[in-house]
A protein has these predicted regions:
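Catalytic machinery of carbohydrate-active enzymes
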Residues: 1-291
Length: 291
C-alpha cells in the first residue's frame, strides 16, 4: 500500500506487542540471516516515545547493516551510527520524520510529511452510492475503544440527523459491527482488507474512530476524523496527523498517560462520557469546514 516500498519483511519481535513471542535462538538467527542476505546499506529504526530501538539495532548490527540510526534515550554504545533525540512535544509522525532527516533522508521540498498510500480501489460496491460517514468501533486495546452501546447510539443519532452511516471492522469484529450498525447502517464488518478499507475511508465524508489503525489510515487518504481518544497515550503525539481532526474524550482523566490496555477506571468515563450528540456536532462541524 505504501509508495516506494519494494519489499516487506515481517518478524514478530519478542520485545513488542501485547503478547510477544518467546525468544527462540533459531528464530533470531533466521532474522539475522535474512537481513544479512539483503546486504542493506542503511537501517532507520522507528519506535514510539516509550520504546527502545536498541534490541533491533543489536540484531541489525549482527546482520552487518552498514549504517543504523534511531531515536534513543539510552546510550547506544556502538549499536547506532546516528543517535537522534526528539524534541519535546513532537507528534510521533514528526518525530519519525526528524529521525529520518538526521540519518540523511530529507523529504522532497513539496512533500508535506503526511503518510501516503497507493490509490485504493473503488469501493462503491461495498458502500453503495451517495455520501456517508464511517464509524469504526473497534480497537486492539479495549481502553482505546468507545463502548459498543455508545457507538450504536451514535450511529442511530447520525442516521437521525440525516447521515448515511457505514460501520467498519475486521474479521474478528463482525459481532461488534453488527451490534453497532443495527438496522440503520451498512455493516462492512469482516468485508474489507487493508486496501479496500482505505478506499472506504477515502470516499467517506468523515470517519469516527478511536485511537486505532483506521483513524490513521483515514488521515493518510485525506479524510477528516472525529477521534474518540482515550488519554492513555497523549493525543498531541498520537492523534491523526495532517487532516482536520476533532478530539473527543477527557484528556485529563485519571488514566491519562498510563498506557493502560484495559481501562483502570470504572465506567470508562474518559470516553463513555462523550455523548452521541457530541459526535453528531463534531461530524457536522467537520463537514461545514470542508465545504
Amino acid at each position: 500500500m505504501l509508495p516506494g516500498v519494494d519489499e516487506v519483511l515481517v518478524w514478530e519481535a519478542p520485545w513488542e506487542g501485547f503478547s510477544p513471542p518467546d525468544v527462540e535462538d533459531a528464530d533470531v538467527a533466521g532474522l539475522i540471516r535474512r537481513v544479512r542476505e539483503g546486504a542493506y546499506d542503511t537501517a532507520l529504526i522507528l519506535t514510539s516515545f516509550h520504546q527502545s530501538p536498541l534490541p533491533a539495532a543489536l540484531l541489525l548490527r549482527m546482520a552487518h547493516v552498514g549504517r543504523i540510526g534511531a531515536d534513543s534515550r539510552d546510550h547506544p554504545g556502538r549499536l547506532l551510527d546516528v543517535r537522534h533525540r526528539r524534541l519535546p512535544g513532537r507528534h510521533e509522525a514528526e518525530a519519525a520524520l526528524d529521525t529520518a532527516a538526521a540519518l540523511g533522508f530529507v523529504p522532497e521540498p513539496r512533500d508535506d510529511g503526511r503518510l501516503r498510500v497507493l490509490p485504493p480501489p473503488d469501493t462503491v460496491g461495498l458502500t453503495g452510492n451517495g455520501p456517508y460517514v464511517v464509524v469504526h468501533p473497534g480497537a486492539s486495546a479495549p481502553a482505546r475503544a468507545w463502548s459498543p452501546y455508545r457507538c450504536a447510539e451514535a450511529v442511530a443519532a447520525l442516521a437521525d440527523a440525516g447521515h448515511r452511516v457505514v460501520v467498519t471492522g475486521g474479521p474478528a469484529e463482525t459481532g461488534l459491527t453488527r451490534e453497532v450498525a443495527g438496522p440503520v447502517a451498512r455493516d462492512l464488518g469482516g468485508r474489507t482488507d487493508s486496501r479496500s478499507l482505505a478506499g472506504v475511508l477515502r470516499s467517506a465524508d468523515v470517519v469516527v474512530s478511536g485511537n486505532t489503525g483506521p483513524a490513521h489510515l483515514a488521515a493518510a487518504v485525506g479524510t477528516p476524523v472525529v477521534s474518540l481518544f482515550s488519554p492513555v497515550v497523549p493525543a498531541d503525539r498520537w492523534a491523526p496527523y495532517g487532516v482536520s481532526t476533532i478530539v473527543l474524550g477527557d484528556q485529563q482523566a485519571a488514566c491519562a498517560g498510563s498506557r493502560a490496555r484495559y481501562c483502570p477506571q470504572p465506567g470508562h468515563p474518559c470516553l463513555d462520557d462523550v455523548t452521541p450528540t457530541d459526535v453528531v456536532l463534531a461530524v457536522q462541524k467537520l463537514l461545514k469546514e470542508s465545504t
